[in-house]
């Protein structure tokens, strides 16, 4: 019952049909569901399977979320995009990705769609040699950044927690639960057991 954008598959199948009519031997390999849509000023794109579909198929999957700039931060006009990359635990097989943002979304989803089609692992995203100039990207492209994050997970350098994990976090004092939003945001609503330490008061070690 998956909804697909059909223009691309239909045109490919038309060529395959014509090839076979003319004594060729072409086959359709299927679609991985790449699509993109414009919603007012924003762009939303997807490729492969999402987390829900992967779990329904019995795949033990993991994911990373990141919100990098569309191009180098010091170059004017950059805007934040948010990526979600889904991969299989253990094998790091790349399963799918979704992106929402304003510019550069289609470029990154096409890179990820190509990586899935080529059978690259999620760990190989960090090694992709992608075009860079400040108006168009960053020296560490958002796709590379996703690969760096997944590599950190594979080495056990970080442990991720997601909003759906909040209720399962211990409230016995064994861990410190921090809400790093501003005091006003904290006052508007917060999860039980979290203490407020605004990110504006945090200093990272140098």
Regions found by a protein language model. Give the residues of each.
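Short hydrophobic beta-strand that contains or immediately precedes a catalytic carboxylate
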Residues: 176-180
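Short glycine-rich anion-binding loops that position phosphate/pyrophosphate groups of nucleotides
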Residues: 182-184
């Amino acid at each position: 019952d998956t909804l697909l954008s059909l223009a691309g598959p239909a045109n490919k199948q038309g060529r395959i049909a014509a090839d076979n009519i003319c004594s060729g031997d072409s086959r359709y390999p299927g679609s991985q569901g790449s699509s993109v849509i414009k919603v007012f000023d924003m762009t939303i794109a997807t490729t492969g399977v999402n987390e829900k579909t992967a779990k329904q198929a019995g795949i033990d999957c993991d994911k990373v979320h990141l919100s990098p700039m569309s191009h180098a931060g010091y170059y004017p006009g950059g805007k934040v995009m948010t990526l979600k990359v889904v991969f299989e635990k253990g094998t790091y097989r790349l399963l799918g990705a979704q992106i929402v943002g304003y510019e550069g979304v289609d470029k990154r989803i096409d890179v990820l769609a190509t990586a899935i089609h080529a059978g690259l692992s999620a760990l190989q995203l960090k090694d992709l040699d992608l075009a860079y100039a400040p108006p168009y990207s960053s020296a560490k492209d958002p796709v590379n950044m996703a690969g760096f994050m997944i590599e950190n997970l594979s080495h056990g350098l970080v442990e991720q927690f997601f909003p759906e994990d909040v209720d399962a976090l211990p409230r016995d004092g064994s861990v410190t639960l921090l809400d790093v939003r501003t005091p006003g945001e904290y006052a508007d609503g917060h999860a039980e057991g979290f203490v407020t330490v605004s990110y504006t008061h945090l200093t990272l070690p140098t």
